[in-house]
A protein has these predicted regions:
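Residues at alpha-helix termini
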Residues: 23, 44-45
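Local sequence-structure signature of Cys/Sec-based thiol-disulfide redox active-site neighborhoods
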Residues: 1-28
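Non-catalytic, surface beta->alpha helical segment in thiol-disulfide oxidoreductase systems
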Residues: 56-84
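Structural micro-motif
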Residues: 45-55
Length: 84
């Protein structure tokens, strides 16, 4: 499961969603102001400075931080896969 933290009118957020849809990955999209606040974003991603912020659930209680869209694209390009 991929979790994408994005914001409205963010081209890289849209690209991350499109990439997940094209690859058939299960994902959730959370939008700033609707699903989380900036404060909550910084609690989960203290070094975040751009959108989107993306993580992958490895196990029920374990998340691996991927980064932004470019890092997600590299992750997918190298054939890294995960299970839900």
């Amino acid at each position: 499961m991929i979790e994408i933290f994005g914001k409205p009118q963010c081209p890289f957020c849209d690209r991350a969603v499109s990439l997940c849809e094209q690859r058939g990955y299960e994902f959730t999209y959370k939008s700033l102001g609707t699903d989380f606040t900036r404060e909550e974003l910084f609690e989960s991603f203290p070094t975040a400075r751009t959108f989107p912020q993306i993580r992958v659930r490895e196990t029920e209680n374990t998340w691996t931080y991927i980064g932004g869209y470019d890092q997600l694209a590299e992750f997918v390009k190298h054939g890294d896969v995960w299970t839900d």
